[in-house]
Amino acid sequence: MREPKRILFVSQQIFPYLDEETPIRLQNRQLPEYFQSHGFETRTFMPKFGEINERRNQLHEVIRLSGINLIISSTDHPLLIKVASIQSARIQIYFIDNDDYFHRRKGVVDANAVEYKDNDERTIFFARGVLETVKKL
C-alpha cells in the first residue's frame, strides 16, 4: 500500500475563521478540501489573528507542537500551535499564534486599512513557525 501524497497549504486567511467571505478566503479553504477528498494528506496553516474566536471555532493548543521560541529581531517569541477542524470539509487547520504578533490584530491591516509596521517580522515569525511545526508533524 502506497503512502498518500502530502500537500502543505499556508495562507494568511481562510474562511470561516475570518468572518468576511471573500473569494480568496473560500479558495484557501476549498483547495485543501479538494485534495483531501482525492486521497492526499493535507496540512493547512494560518496565523491565529486576534479576531478568531477560540471558543466558537473550538481551537485548542497542541502541546507537543508548541513551546519553542523563535528569535525575530534579536528577541525571543514563544510559538504556540493551535488546531481546529472544519467539520463539513473534514480538514484540520493549524494556527500559528503569538501574543506579541497576532493577539490584538484582525489581520495585516488596522481598522483604517493601514499596514502594521511590524508586518515583516510577523510574516517571518509565521513562516518560521510553519517550518518548525512541520518538522515535528
Question: Residue ranges of each PLM-predicted region?
Answer:
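N-terminal subdomain of nucleotide-sugar transferases
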Residues: 1-84
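A conserved catalytic-core segment of Leloir-type glycosyltransferases
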Residues: 48-136
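Alpha-helix C-cap/termination motif
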Residues: 38, 136-137
